[in-house]
Amino acid sequence: MRIFRYLEDSRTYLGVLLEDGTAYRLNAPDLMTLVGEARKAGASTADYVQSLLSELVSIHAAPESLALLTPVDAPEVWAAGVTYQKSREARNYEATAGKLDASTFYDKVYDAERPELFMKSTSARTVGPGEQVGLRSDSTWQVPEAELGLVLDRTGAIIGYTAGNDMSCRDIEGENPLYLPQAKIWRNSCSIGPYVRLAETLADPYDLTISCRIYRDGVKVVDESGSTGQLKRRLEELAGFLKRDNELFDGTVLLTGTCLVPPNQFTLASGDRIEIEIASIGTLVNTAAYAHELEQA
């Protein structure tokens, strides 16, 4: 069972997509309100929605044809780093200028008890399906990072799963680790969507194929895939560290790291179409653009 948000006649609605492909408009204004209603009814969110189906209005169009928004208006998006061997290798390549001739702090954090966690985005900087993701004007090595996102409540409990794009500047991050915020956070540097798969309806979050495809002028230039089965850490472990002595907000999203990285010689260009697909969740599609192009959009 997947939850989505969409815009129709200047109004925002919440919808649900069932396994048989049928979709319905929900009466709750947003995901976290829906979760709260289910808890008051003493039911899981999925069971609560199931009990409402006979009262709901059907959506006859395919959700992908609607004006989809971020499935949850996340007040904050956090991210975990170096949680996959592939990510570790990519960070080491950047930190050693491609020489791979020394152990780095990325090796240490990969094996450390404490994971790398950092602030990635805010609601205003996060975009949804079909929107443009931003490119920095001062970077020459930019890539998308396809990641499984955890949708959390204020206690750190996992409400559901979404697809996320952690846009990154490999040259800025590799130049100096203290530049990480600049390598990760700027206008439209994060996208999530198109759905939130309710946690209770996903059998095994460690058995999801993640794919990233990039098209330039209609030609596929990147096609990479990996699996959450390669994740070094447990999802609850990452959420647990995030909530430790921290205030979480309902609808916070935690991106859990990337298991795939485009080839080292690749960098995004304006107009590139990015498709991030996670099995059982959906395909998040965005187009890359520079800031001055975003202002014209």
Each predicted region: which residue ranges?
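Glycine-centered flexibility motif
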Residues: L7, T12-G15, G42, G130, ...
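Short acidic-glycine loop/turn motifs at beta-strand connectors
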Residues: L7-S10, L17-T22, L152-G156, Y215-V219, ...
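Catalytic-pocket segment enriched in acidic/His residues
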Residues: D9, R170-A297
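Short, acidic/polar N-cap/turn motifs at the starts of alpha helices
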Residues: M1-I3, T12-Y13, E147, T209-S211, ...
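Generic N-terminal segment detector
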Residues: M1-K86, A95, S103, E237, ...
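Active-site microenvironments in enzyme catalytic cores
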Residues: D47-R216
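A generic structural motif
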Residues: D30, N165, S227-T228
